[in-house]
Amino acid sequence: MTASAWIRTVFAVAVAVTCSAQPSAQSGPSIRFTETKLANGLRVILSEDHTAPVYSIIVHYNVGSRDERPGRTGFAHLFEHMMFKGSENVGPGEHFMLVFNNGGTMNGTTNKDRTLYFETLPANQLDLGIYLEADRMRSLEITKANLDNQRNAVQEERRQGLDNQAYGRSEELIDELAYDNPAYKHSVIGSMADLSAASVDDVASFFKIYYAPNNAVLAIVGDLDPKVTLEKVRKAFGTIPAQPAPPKVDMTEPVQTAERRQRVDDPLARLARVNLAYKVPPRTSDEDDAVRVLGTILSTGRSSRFFQKIVREQQLASSVFAGRDSAIGPGLFGISATVAPGKTPEAVEAAVLAEIERLKSGPIEAWEIEKAQNNAKRAVVTGLTSSLQRGIQLAEFASVFDDTGRINQRAERIAKVTAANVQRVAAKYLTAANRTVVVTVPRPAAKGGAQ
C-alpha cells in the first residue's frame, strides 16, 4: 500500500466550531461541505452526495517523511503498513476482511507531508468505516511481532520499488542533492539501516505524537446525512484524547548558490535520462499558480514546447515531463527527459535549457495560457468524479491551506495567471545557480546481476 484558501463561515456550537462553504459562482463545479472541529482537535469535513449509494471515509494525518529525524527515517511509511495490523477491537487482518466482505475497498498512502488512510463502502455500512478508523486511532496494536513483520515487508518493498528499479537511485538522489534541510532530503520509504534499527518503543512514541485527533483531518463524502453522520463521528472519535502538539519542523531551505550535478551509472536502465530540479516556493505561496502554469506550457500534451521542439522536431528525447512536485514546500520544479536512442544526454540537456531561456525572453502565446486554464478546469471536474477523490482533496486543502473552501477556487486562481507572471517565476527560479542535475547513464550489469 503505498498525490490549491477557501470561503468559510464560522459559528460556535457548544465546544465545536462548525463551518459551511458555498461555491464561487465563477469557479465551475464545486464541492459543498460542512466543517466541524471537535473538542479534541479533530477536524471533521462532511460532504453530502446522493449520486450513488456509497461513501468514502478519509483520515488525513499531518505526518510524513518530513517529520522524521535523522536515523529514524521511514517511520511514516512504516505506519502505512502497521495501521492495518490490528487494534484493540479489530484483530490482525480483520480490517481488510470487514471492508472487503462488506463490498468495500481500502488503502493508504504516504508522502513527504502527510499520510492518508481511506475506505469506500456501501452507504448502509457507515458505522463500519467510522468504527474501524476510530479504533485504530485510539488503540493501534504495536507489538514486536507486528513491527518485525511489517519492517520486512517495507524493506522488500524498497528492494522491489527502488533499489532494483531502473532510475530508482537517480530519483532518490535528486532530493538528496537538491535539499540542504534534512526534512526533505531522504526518501519517504526510508533507509534499510534505519528500518532495521527501529524498536517497538521508537515506533510507539512516533504513533503517540503524530496519530492523534488534533493532528488529523477526517473527511466523509457520499450518500449520507451530515447531521446523523456528525453524531456518529462524535460518539466514535470524540473521546479519543488529544496529545501535545507535534514539534514543528523547520522547513527553512538555504538559498542555493551554484549548480549541483551528479552522474549515475545504472545497470537497470536501457536509455539515458536527464533530470533537472529547481527549488520553488511552498504551495501556499502566491507564486505557486504561476509555477504550475509554467509546467503546463513546457510539457503538458503534444502541443507543449518541450514536445514540439525536443521530441518532435529535434527528436532528441522520447519524452520530456515538467512540473512542480506535490510537496508543501519549499518544493521542486522537476524536468525529466528520457534520451532517445542514439542521442546524448548533453544534447538533451542543452535543448531543455534553450527552451527555458526562450520562454523567459520570448512571447508566451495567449493560447498557451488558455490551455493551462482549460487543463485546470478539467482537473477540477475529474477530481469530483468519485467520493474518494473529493474527500482526499477536502482533507488536503484543510490541512495545507487551513482554508477548505479554497478547493472551489482552483480554476478561478489559474485564470488570473498572466504570461508576465509565468515569465517572472521562470526567470526567478529556473536559473543555473538554483539547479540540480542528475544524469542517468545505462551501463552493463556487473557479473551476477543487480543486488
Whereabouts are the PLM-identified features?
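Positively charged n-region of N-terminal signal peptides that target proteins for export
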Residues: 1-8
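Proteolytic maturation boundary segments
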Residues: 4, 13-44, 225-265, 273, ...
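Histidine-acidic residue clusters that define the catalytic metal-binding segment
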Residues: 26-36, 135, 157, 175-216, ...
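M16 family metallopeptidases and their MPP-like homologs
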Residues: 47, 52-70, 74-78, 92-136, ...
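Active-site His/Glu-centered metal-binding helix of metallohydrolases
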Residues: 75-83, 294
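Short, polar/flexible loop-turn hinges at active-site or ligand-entry regions and domain interfaces
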Residues: 85-90, 137-145, 364
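Non-catalytic, conformational "gating/processing" segments within enzyme and secreted inhibitor domains
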Residues: 151-152, 204-236, 433-435
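His/Glu-based metal-binding/catalytic segments typifying zinc-dependent metallopeptidases
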Residues: 159, 176, 245-303
